[in-house]
A protein has these predicted regions:
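DNA-recognition alpha helix
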Residues: 28-39
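Short, basic alpha-helical nucleic acid-contact segments in DNA-binding proteins
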Residues: 49-67
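Active-site beta-loop-alpha junctions of metal-dependent nucleic acid enzymes
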Residues: 102-124
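Mobile genetic element proteins and their domesticated derivatives, centered on retroelements
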Residues: 17, 31, 47, 76, ...
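Conserved small/polar residues in nucleotide/adenosyl-binding loops
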Residues: 202-205
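Helix-centered, glycine/charged polyanion-binding patches within enzymatic domains
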Residues: 134-191, 195-198
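Two-metal-ion RNase H-like nuclease active-site motif
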Residues: 69-81
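Basic, short loop/linker segments at the boundary and entry of helix-turn-helix/winged-helix-like folds
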Residues: 1-22, 43, 68
Length: 205
């Protein structure tokens, strides 16, 4: 499928613009200025539309290619500010530090954690272990899932220091708090950021 068909600008321009925005802590206007300095005149609103569209495409293609993770997962939630209000980002990574999935929600509770863990099970099956912090909602959600037959052989570990890796990975996402304008656009942007990070990590291994 040609994801660039019918676009006014060439594929290379779109890829560079989206890459600048997702990889660096830049605003859409700052990306516009960088492109203008290179002789490319494109409006910041067009760059915004590209980021929203191609972040989702990148994320979909990455997840389609990477669907197996059997050993262990690390999972937690963190705070993301969107238009002055706090939201909660659930995120899971595999044993190699690659993102399995993310989910941005308005509430942080057992129901949200339950739905995210169920979604992970549907996509990736059952790992040997899931490492989380000691948030009550995560433990409660895991026990509820086991009571209905999911994760029967998975060990749930709540050792705080095993989760330091995923906590550190939240920093680039949080640095962009001032740019998030809605739950939908923040979710798309974060998916794009996570995908580029995963691709870069894979190439460096």
């Amino acid at each position: 499928m040609n994801h660039f068909k019918g676009k006014q600008f060439k594929k290379d321009v779109i890829i560079v613009a989206v890459g600048y925005y997702l990889r660096y802590n830049l605003s859409y206007r700052e990306v516009q200025e960088l492109l203008y300095d290179r002789g490319i005149n494109v409006c910041h609103t067009t760059i915004y539309r590209w980021v929203q569209e191609y972040s989702k495409v990148l994320y979909y293609l990455w997840k389609k290619k990477n669907r197996q993770s059997f050993y262990s997962w690390k999972m937690d939630e963190t705070y993301i500010k969107i238009k002055g209000r706090w939201h909660y980002l659930y995120r899971a990574i595999d044993a190699d530090g690659l993102t399995l999935d993310i989910w941005l929600r308005k509430k942080r509770d057992t129901q949200a954690a339950y739905a995210f863990l169920k979604r992970l099970h549907k996509q990736f099956g059952e790992p040997k272990a899931i490492v989380t912090d000691k948030a009550p909602s995560l433990g409660s959600a895991f026990r509820k899932l086991q009571s209905v037959g999911l994760y029967p052989k998975t060990e749930h570990r709540t050792v705080k220091y095993l989760n330091n890796l995923i906590e550190q990975d939240h920093r680039p996402i949080k640095r962009r708090n001032k740019f998030y304008q809605s739950l939908r656009t923040a979710s798309s942007t974060i998916k794009g950021m996570e995908t580029l990070r995963a691709v870069s990590y894979t190439h460096l291994r």
